[in-house]
Amino acid sequence: MEAILKIGDIVENKYQIEKLLNRGGMDSYLFLAKNLNLKNYGPVQKKQYGHLVLKVVQKNPKINENNWKKFLDEMVTTTRVHHSNLVKSFDVVNPFLKIVRGNKTIALNQIVMIAMEYVDGPSLRQLLNRKGYFSVSEVVYYFTKIVKAIDYLHSFKHQIIHRDLKPENILFTSDLTDIKLLDFGIASTVVKVAEKTEVLTDENSLFGTVSYMIPDVLESTVNKAGKKVRKPPNAQYDIYSLGIILFEMLVGRVPFNKSINPNKERETIQKARNFDLPLMQATRSDIPNSLENIAFRCTAVKRENNKWLYSSTKELLEDLANWENEQAMIKPANERVLEGQVEIREMMLEKPLAWYFKTWALSIFTIVFIGLIIAAIVLLLIFNARF
């Protein structure tokens, strides 16, 4: 894909490629491009839209024509989605792309290109790496904007589920006063494709990022034809991801010990089904119960906690609006089953009691033995000093 567009290429006589920025969802590539179509723009617009991001996606051979057509239709839909906290899409070109490279004109087929707003600030991931975590007031301010953007997508006439919410897809403006969500178009389309896709055993077929994926992504259902298919996603897919992001913004890490082993992705994703969310107050004493409860309700996918799980982003926004009100903890610390506690318990059960006595006895013997050696050396030094 990197060879398809090169620095200096002029795309559709509108955009000139300046550099490759990054990889995106669905094996797409993001390029920074100069906007050559600014004749009718005023000074402010020229400054704002002088550079755009071009997202380029080439048709995957595994996607059939019907699903590819749906994908193209959804890309056009993204240009109609307008919210202050969503990256704007201005232009969609498909399925042919015309490139001028030097004296050559190249025509590419089975490609879709989306021209999007360029946000020149850092991502949430970059800020987390730099700051560690945010203050409570900062979190409420930014997180509310993120949730409002997702609520808008969920309220759209063809409900759009993002499905890949993570700090890398949350961008800040250069002055850090606002945020923009990225990749909502790509993710929503995959939802439609996934509903008709058979459940695959290949771990890489899972769409999203493991640390932010709700365990429901592993569940399947049987369609009218008796075929096993993936369970259609719903609003709680994004709500769960929001809870993980809220936790990470306040604490600086994801809640579960999710060391990503490519061979154990399913086991990692299931952890939220088996363990409770750790209390953030164990790390920071200034976190109010209200935010503890919001994070808990977003991620309450453990069977016994389902009664607290948010059913919509509107419920979440109501709680965010009242975050300063005093409230009791929904599930106190002594009632939560935490990942680390269970691992220690399981480790102890794997070893017989005699093994622990033997280990402790050996440790005590070693300490006493070393102490005697040190004492002997000290006495010897004292003796030599006197005589």
Curated annotation (Swiss-Prot):
The compartments listed are: Cell membrane
Q: What is its EC number?
A: 2.7.11.1
Q: Please indicate if the UniProt record lists Heme as a keyword.
A: no
In the record, biological process GO terms are: signal transduction
Q: Which residues cross the membrane?
A: 232-252, 363-383
Q: Name one GO molecular function term.
A: protein serine kinase activity
Pfam hit, one: Pkinase
What sequence ranges are listed for the domain Protein kinase? 15-344
> Topology with regard to the membrane?
Multi-pass membrane protein
Superkingdom, according to UniProt?
A: Bacteria
Q: Which Gene3D superfamilies does the record cross-reference, listed alphabetically?
A: Phosphorylase Kinase, domain 1, Transferase(Phosphotransferase) domain 1
Q: Which family does it belong to?
A: Belongs to the protein kinase superfamily. Ser/Thr protein kinase family.
Protein name according to UniProt: Putative serine/threonine-protein kinase
Q: Which organism is it from?
A: Mycoplasma genitalium (strain ATCC 33530 / DSM 19775 / NCTC 10195 / G37)
